[in-house]
């Protein structure tokens, strides 16, 4: 029965076609429904600073919803990725951009644009940019300030910016009356691994302007710090024949003839109380002395306040307190 066999083969062939079509529809591989891959172009980097940049590019989504991100890092292996963002579903090229942060100064970075759509993932060409150097800057403080005459102090600070570590710097001083200009004090020193430094200073005899500057190029100069020198004062007590009175005497270094001494009673939690005073008199080429009587109204801790009048070479200071009973 030839007709019967031909009909049976035709039915089987038709069934096979239907089953194949169903399989393609289930797997999403129907030729008519296949999505084209997006096209991408990695653009240039803009707004590049020492710690951030904006990466740019173009994405053509080919009419289907597409996302994009940027890969970036210090090598062609990248290692970092920006957040996934929508690029739309246009049939034309669309400009995209993302800002990245946390970058290192003076460093070359690789980056590329990557688009992700139903038709696949496509990466653009690799491009590079270099972050700029952080300009060097100096900050410093002196401690203690004021410093007591004859005592050491320190000039400490930081050289910040690219290349601030292990950099040669020098300390410079311009002593009172600040007309001689800045002169280098001591030898150059190297900053530490994080740009920090500390200059010890012993022997400053008058108020001085201080600064730190780099050695070589680029020349970077710190703000000026005024280091003041307080007179050194001592005070002692001696009994007198006059009832209710004591004699307070002491020295002032350096010599400050004409300065005024005030005797003060100290009261915890309250302002000091003036109890009289006396002028400072010349004693030697390097020190002055004072001596004066004070009425002792009550026992307690007393100190001497030395008010200098040398037109700015030194600043006033207190003696250490003494107990008078």
Which sequence ranges carry the predicted segments?
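Alpha-helical and His/Cys-centered functional microenvironments
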Residues: 9, 13, 33
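N-terminal secretory signal peptides that target proteins for export/translocation
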Residues: 1-10
């Amino acid at each position: 029965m030839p007709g019967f066999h031909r009909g049976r083969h035709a039915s089987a062939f038709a069934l096979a076609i239907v089953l194949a079509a169903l399989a393609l529809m289930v797997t999403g591989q129907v030729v008519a429904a296949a999505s084209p891959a997006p096209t991408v172009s990695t653009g240039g980097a803009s707004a590049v600073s020492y710690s951030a940049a904006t990466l740019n590019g173009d994405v053509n989504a080919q009419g289907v919803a597409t996302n994009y991100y940027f890969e970036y890092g210090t090598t062609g292996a990248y290692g970092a990725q920006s957040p996934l963002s929508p690029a739309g579903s246009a049939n034309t090229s669309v400009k995209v951009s993302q800002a990245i942060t946390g970058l290192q100064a003076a460093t070359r970075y690789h980056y590329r644009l990557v688009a992700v759509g139903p038709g696949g993932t496509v990466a653009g060409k690799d491009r590079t940019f270099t972050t700029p150097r952080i300009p060097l800057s100096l900050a410093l403080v002196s401690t203690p300030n004021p410093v007591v005459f004859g005592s050491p102090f320190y000039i400490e600070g930081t050289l910040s910016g690219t290349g601030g570590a292990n950099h040669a710097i020098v300390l410079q001083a311009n002593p009172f009356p600040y007309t001689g200009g800045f002169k280098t004090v001591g030898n150059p020193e190297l900053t530490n691994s994080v740009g920090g430094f500390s200059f010890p200073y012993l022997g400053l005899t008058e108020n001085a302007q201080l600064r730190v500057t780099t050695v070589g190029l680029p020349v970077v100069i710190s703000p000026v710090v005024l280091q003041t020198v307080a007179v050194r004062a001592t005070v002692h007590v001696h009994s007198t024949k006059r009832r209710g009175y004591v004699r307070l005497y002491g020295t002032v270094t350096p010599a400050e003839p004409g300065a005024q001494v005030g005797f003060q009673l100290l009261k915890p939690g309250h302002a000091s109380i003036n109890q009289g005073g006396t002028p400072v008199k010349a004693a030697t080429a390097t020190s002055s002395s004072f001596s004066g009587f004070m009425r002792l109204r009550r026992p307690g801790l007393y100190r001497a306040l030395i008010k200098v009048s040398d037109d700015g070479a030194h600043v006033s200071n207190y003696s250490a307190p003494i107990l008078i009973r």
